[in-house]
Each structure stands twice: as C-alpha cells, then as structure tokens.
C-alpha cells in the first residue's frame, strides 16, 4: 500500500509539472505571436511611410526638373529667335502656336522625364558616380550648356559643318567633364536622337522652322544641343536624387 500511494503521488506530481510546462509554453507562444504582430505592424507602417516619402520626393523632383526645363527653354529659345535661327511661319501666327506656349511645356516635360531616368539607370546598372556631386558642379554644367547654345547662335563659321563639329566637341567635353558615365552618354544620345526626330516632324508639318536648314529640315548642330541638354538635366536629376536619399536616411 505505501508503494501504491507513493506511485500515485509521483504520478500526480508529474502530471502537474507537465501541465505547468504546457501552460508556460502556451504563454510563450502567445507572447511571441503578439510580439511578431507588433513588429509586423511597425514594419508595415515604416514601409508605408517610406513609400509615401519616396513618392513625395519623386513628385517634388519632377516638379523642380519641369520648372528648370521651362526656364531653360524660355532663355535658350529667346537667344535663337534674337539671331533669327528659328522662325514661325505667318500662317501659324494666327493659331494657338503663335505664342509658342507649347515649347516650354514640352521642354519642361522632357526635362522631368530625362532627369528622373538618369538616377534610375545609375541604380539599375550599378554604375557608381565618378565625381563627388555638389550643386556648384551642377551650376557649372548649366553654365557650359547655356554657353554652347549661345555659341550656336552667335558664332559665325565658314560653313555649318565646322560649327556642328565644334559644338559636337564641346558637347562631348561637357559630358566628359561633368558625367563620364555610360548611362549618361547613352541616355544623352537617345535624347538627342528622339528630340531631333520630333523637331524634324514639327518643321515638316509647318509648325516650326529653321532658317537655312542643312540637316533635312533643321540645323545640323541641333543634336549637339539636345545631347548637352540631356546631360545637363541628368546631372540636375542626379543631384536632386542624392539630396532626397540623404534626407530619407536622416529621417
């Protein structure tokens, strides 16, 4: 009998210990689930905030690039008109195109697209920047671009071929000085080809025209202007992207 009582007591003790272990394990599992839920909620909220911040920065950068493109278009087109490089036909003056309001808008939109594409290509290609980016370098790039456009309107060469070769060398020098990236060269070249094609179509349809065209309907140096403009806008877009990234990290 004593042995039976001892056996029953040991069984009851072991059962109570197992029950306590199971309850402890259940409590740990419950608390772990609560902690995982809290962590998931915090991470989801952080991701949502980061995504919203990135979207806001993208819109802000696009607006800045659009404004820059509009301002550059107004200034550079004024230089061309003063030298009678570009003209508007008389029949167009009676239409909505007479004020050429669409030129700055188109240039602003193109600047926003190109400026946003440059940092995206850098990120996807994994191509590091050759230089330490700063706004002083970007401003010098803008000054050189305006100088190239001014030279296209002011300089007088014996023929347009010499002018085109000179501007091509200056445009490549601008890319080499302020960029030197394959993505920058490729996107600048693509911008030059597409913009020149669009200009050809506009002139062909009588909306726009150039005096003394020597490259189908436009001037032969026009692709050089578009190339240097694409590189310039790309540098602005990269600088804006770097500033936005640093701000996000600080936040």
Swiss-Prot record:
Feature type site, description Required for the recognition of 25-hydroxycholesterol: 145
Q: Does the keyword Endoplasmic reticulum apply?
A: yes
Chief site of localization:
endoplasmic reticulum
Q: Does the keyword Transmembrane apply?
A: yes
Topological domains annotated Extracellular: 82-100, 157-159, 206-219
**Which controlled-vocabulary keywords does the entry list?**
Cholesterol metabolism, Endoplasmic reticulum, Lipid metabolism, Lipid-binding, Membrane, Steroid metabolism, Sterol metabolism, Transmembrane, Transmembrane helix
One BP annotation, GO = SREBP signaling pathway
**What do the Gene Ontology cellular component annotations say?**
endoplasmic reticulum; SREBP-SCAP-Insig complex
Where does this one sit in the cell?
A: Endoplasmic reticulum membrane
Topology with regard to the membrane?
Multi-pass membrane protein
Which residue ranges does UniProt annotate as crossing the membrane? 59-81, 101-118, 134-156, 160-178, 184-205, 220-237
* Subunit structure, as described in the record: Interacts with scap; interaction is direct and only takes place in the presence of sterols; it prevents interaction between scap and the coat protein complex II (COPII). Associates with the SCAP-SREBP complex; association is mediated via its interaction with scap and only takes place in the presence of sterols.
Stated name of the protein = Insulin-induced gene 1 protein
Q: Gene encoding it?
A: insig1
């Amino acid at each position: 009998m004593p042995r039976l009582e001892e056996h029953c007591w040991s069984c009851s003790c072991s059962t109570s210990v197992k029950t306590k272990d199971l309850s402890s394990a259940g409590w740990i599992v419950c608390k772990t689930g609560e902690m995982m839920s809290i962590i998931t909620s915090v991470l989801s909220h952080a991701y949502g905030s980061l995504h919203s911040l990135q979207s806001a920065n993208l819109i802000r950068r696009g607006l800045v690039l659009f404004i820059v493109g509009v301002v550059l278009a107004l200034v550079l087109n004024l230089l061309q008109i003063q030298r009678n490089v570009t003209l508007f036909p008389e029949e167009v003056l009676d239409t909505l195109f007479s004020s050429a309001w669409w030129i700055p808008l188109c240039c602003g939109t193109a600047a926003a697209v190109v400026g946003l594409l440059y940092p995206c290509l850098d990120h996807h290609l994994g191509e590091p920047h050759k230089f330490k980016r700063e706004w002083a370098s970007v401003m010098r790039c803008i000054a050189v671009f305006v100088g190239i456009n001014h030279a296209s309107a002011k300089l007088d060469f014996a023929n347009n071929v010499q002018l085109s070769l000179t501007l091509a060398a200056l445009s490549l020098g601008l890319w080499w000085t302020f960029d030197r990236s394959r993505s920058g060269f490729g996107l600048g070249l693509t911008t030059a080809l597409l913009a020149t094609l669009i200009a050809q179509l506009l002139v062909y349809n009588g909306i726009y025209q150039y005096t003394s065209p020597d490259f189908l309907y436009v001037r032969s140096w026009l692709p050089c202007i578009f190339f240097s403009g694409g590189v310039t806008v790309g540098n602005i877009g990269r600088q804006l992207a770097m500033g936005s990234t640093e701000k996000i990290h600080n936040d």
